[in-house]
């Protein structure tokens, strides 16, 4: 039987800023505490975005020690020296239980996949974060794949592992730069600005009752 061309057969989820609170909140706090201009850290990461220290770290080309020095040099060139180790300490946010319940609801109806740019494989970090892996049929981590969002190879591999055509997938991410190439491939995309709004959009696309999943207030982000 031919597949329904409009059917959603996989839901792809980003980690930071989607399933957890955004590390950008921790970045902003760090900048305030040290008198840096707002958005300084993101600005460093946005300079030469395909080959800077951050990109090479996420592809597994730099270890944390070499990243520490490389990011310090790049940030110094931008006006303020920030050790890369300081940035790494800001990456882990707090889990959003309501989003994880939505993942579980989707998994009853489709393949669920986690698509994350990371430094350390999730099974090597905090137990609470590592436990997230059990919610997904497919896990794609830049630290293990040698490619990262928004590189097309990352998305092609994710769809192949989920055994879906891009047109059969919905992808949730908090960064437009990551969503743009996925949308160009044919995926339906949702930019996550708030969990509630994102789940409303997901429910509208799929027709599934994910928006009814009880959302809980988030705890403050920790560093």
For each feature predicted by the language model, list its residue ranges:
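Catalytic-core regions built around general acid/base machinery
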Residues: 98-109, 135
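N-terminal helical cap/lid subdomain that shapes the substrate entry/recognition surface
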Residues: 3-100, 119
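Asp-based, Mg2+/Mn2+-dependent phosphohydrolase catalytic module
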Residues: 1-9, 13, 119-120, 124-223
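A generic secondary-structure signal
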Residues: 74, 102-105, 161
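Generic structural signal for small/hydrophobic residues in well-ordered secondary structure
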Residues: 14-17, 60, 106, 114, ...
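Broad structural signal for hydrophobic residues in well-ordered alpha-helices, predominantly aliphatic
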Residues: 30-31, 71, 106, 158, ...
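Residue-level detector of anion-binding/catalytic polar loops
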Residues: 111-112, 188
């Amino acid at each position: 039987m031919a597949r329904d061309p409009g059917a959603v057969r996989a839901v792809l989820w980003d980690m930071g800023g989607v399933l957890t609170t955004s590390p950008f909140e921790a970045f902003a706090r760090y900048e305030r505490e040290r008198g840096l201009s707002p958005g300084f850290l993101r600005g460093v990461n946005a300079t030469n975005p395909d080959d800077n220290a951050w990109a090479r770290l996420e592809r597994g080309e730099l270890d944390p020690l070499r990243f520490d020095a490389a990011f310090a040099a790049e940030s110094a060139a931008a006006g303020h020296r920030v050790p890369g180790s300081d940035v790494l300490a800001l990456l882990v946010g707090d889990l959003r239980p309501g989003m994880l319940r939505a993942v579980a609801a989707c998994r009853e109806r489709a393949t669920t996949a986690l698509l994350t740019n990371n430094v350390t494989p999730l099974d090597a970090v905090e137990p609470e974060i590592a436990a997230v892996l059990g919610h997904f049929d497919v896990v794609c981590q830049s630290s293990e794949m040698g490619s990262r969002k928004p590189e097309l190879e990352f998305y092609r591999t994710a769809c192949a592992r989920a055994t879906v055509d891009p047109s059969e997938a919905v992808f949730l991410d908090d960064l437009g730069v990551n969503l743009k190439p996925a949308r160009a491939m044919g995926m339906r995309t949702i930019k996550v600005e708030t969990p509630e709004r994102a789940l409303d959009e997901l429910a509208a696309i799929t027709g599934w009752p994910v928006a009814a999943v009880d959302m809980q207030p988030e705890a403050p982000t920790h560093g």
